[in-house]
Curated annotation (Swiss-Prot):
This is RNA-binding protein Hfq. The keyword RNA-binding applies. Belongs to the Hfq family. The lineage of its organism: Bacteria, Thermotogati, Thermotogota, Thermotogae, Thermotogales. The keyword Protease does not apply. Keywords: RNA-binding, Stress response. Homohexamer. It comes from Thermotoga petrophila (strain ATCC BAA-488 / DSM 13995 / JCM 10881 / RKU-1).
Length: 90
C-alpha cells in the first residue's frame, strides 16, 4: 500500500527546515509574521525576532509563505492525482 501523503505536515516541515518566513492569518482576523520553529498535531510555534507565539491550529485560517513551496515534483503530482481519481471512482 502506498505511503499516506500528509500535506499539512510536509508543508509546515518544509517551511520550518528551509526557514521560509510566513504570514499567518487567524480566524479572528489577526495576522502575524514569522518563522515556524516547531509544530505538532494541535499547535504551531511561530518566532518573530525575540518573540515566540504558540498558536493553536484551530485558530489558523491561512498560512502564506514568502516564497513558492514545491512539495513534490510534477511527475509525482500527476501520479497522485490519477491515484486519487481511481480511489474516488471505487
Amino acid at each position: 500500500m502506498a505511503e499516506k501523503f500528509n500535506l499539512q505536515d510536509r508543508f509546515l516541515n518544509h517551511l520550518r527546515v528551509n526557514k521560509i518566513e510566513v504570514k499567518v492569518y487567524l480566524v479572528n482576523g489577526f495576522q502575524t509574521k514569522g518563522f515556524i520553529r516547531s509544530f505538532d498535531s494541535y499547535t504551531v510555534l511561530l518566532e518573530s525576532g525575540n518573540q515566540q507565539s504558540l498558536i493553536y491550529k484551530h485558530a489558523i485560517s491561512t498560512i502564506i509563505p514568502s516564497s513558492y513551496v514545491m512539495l513534490m515534483p510534477r511527475k509525482q503530482e500527476t501520479a497522485q492525482e490519477a491515484e486519487t481519481s481511481e480511489n474516488e471512482g471505487s
